[in-house]
């Protein structure tokens, strides 16, 4: 079983913000693979299904970004998942819109959601897919909690299916395969 987690913040006011790109990817994958993400459990909302004949759980933690690790830890403990069976997708301000970066493991890189996950899991050896949301021109909080411009939103709508494909590559094969295929790609 593979856990696919999209990071974001709960609540209408955060929908379609840069910080909620992980939620957007989970919504896309749920629709594409006919997985109902509607069960409130493990401090989140989740659903089970199959991708590439592998059982997956899609999860959107409802703890707010900075406490995401609590939700993931509860689910991972319940299903006895290893860290490398958890894939996390989230926003990255160091990448331009249209770029993504897959990593097998690594530090939080200043992302509080990832910091919470590392603290709660007790390690950093879980694959992650970083989705570029562009660099802030001024205030970081306003940037990540702000909505995309109309032009950027149209661009991100082209990016989300590619992010989904990168995650499926990890599910099917592994993070290295996905890294080779998707790192460095610029989605126009």
From Swiss-Prot:
UniProt GO cellular component terms: cytoplasm
tRNA-binding is among the record's keywords: yes
Binding site for tRNA: 14, 64, 66, 112
EC code(s) of this entry: 3.1.1.29
Pfam families membership: Pept_tRNA_hydro
GO molecular function: peptidyl-tRNA hydrolase activity; tRNA binding
Reactions catalysed: an N-acyl-L-alpha-aminoacyl-tRNA + H2O = an N-acyl-L-amino acid + a tRNA + H(+)
Site entry: Discriminates between blocked and unblocked aminoacyl-tRNA: 9
Main location group: cytoplasm
Origin superkingdom: Bacteria
Compartment annotation: Cytoplasm
Keyword RNA-binding: yes
UniProt keyword terms in alphabetical order: Cytoplasm, Hydrolase, RNA-binding, tRNA-binding
SUPFAM superfamilies the record matches: Peptidyl-tRNA hydrolase-like
Active-site residues from the entry: 19
Site (Stabilizes the basic form of H active site to accept a proton): 91
An example Gene Ontology biological process: rescue of stalled ribosome
InterPro entries: Pept_tRNA_hydro (IPR001328), Pept_tRNA_hydro_CS (IPR018171), Pept_tRNA_hydro_sf (IPR036416)
Subunit structure: Monomer.
Family classification: Belongs to the PTH family.
Role of this protein: Hydrolyzes ribosome-free peptidyl-tRNAs (with 1 or more amino acids incorporated), which drop off the ribosome during protein synthesis, or as a result of ribosome stalling. Catalyzes the release of premature peptidyl moieties from peptidyl-tRNA molecules trapped in stalled 50S ribosomal subunits, and thus maintains levels of free tRNAs and 50S ribosomes.
NCBIfam families: pth
UniProt-recorded name of the protein: Peptidyl-tRNA hydrolase
The organism of origin for this protein: Clostridium perfringens (strain 13 / Type A)
């Amino acid at each position: 079983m593979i856990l696919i987690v999209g990071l974001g913040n709960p609540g209408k006011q955060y929908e379609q913000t840069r910080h909620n790109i992980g939620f957007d990817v989970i919504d896309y994958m749920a629709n594409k693979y006919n997985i109902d993400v509607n069960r409130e459990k493990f401090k989140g909302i989740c659903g089970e299904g199959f991708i590439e004949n592998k059982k997956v759980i899609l999860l959107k933690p409802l703890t707010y970004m900075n406490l995401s690790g609590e939700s993931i830890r509860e689910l991972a403990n319940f299903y006895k998942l290893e860290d490398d069976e958890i894939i996390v997708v989230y926003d990255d301000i160091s990448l331009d819109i249209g770029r993504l970066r897959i990593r097998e493991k690594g530090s939080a890189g200043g992302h509080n959601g990832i910091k919470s996950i590392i603290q709660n899991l007790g390690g950093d050896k879980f694959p992650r897919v970083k989705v570029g949301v562009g660099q802030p021109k001024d205030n970081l909080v306003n940037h990540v909690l702000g909505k995309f411009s109309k032009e950027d939103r149209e661009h991100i709508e082209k990016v989300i299916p590619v992010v989904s494909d990168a995650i499926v590559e990890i599910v099917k094969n592994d993070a290295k395969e996905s890294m080779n295929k998707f790192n460095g790609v610029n989605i126009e």
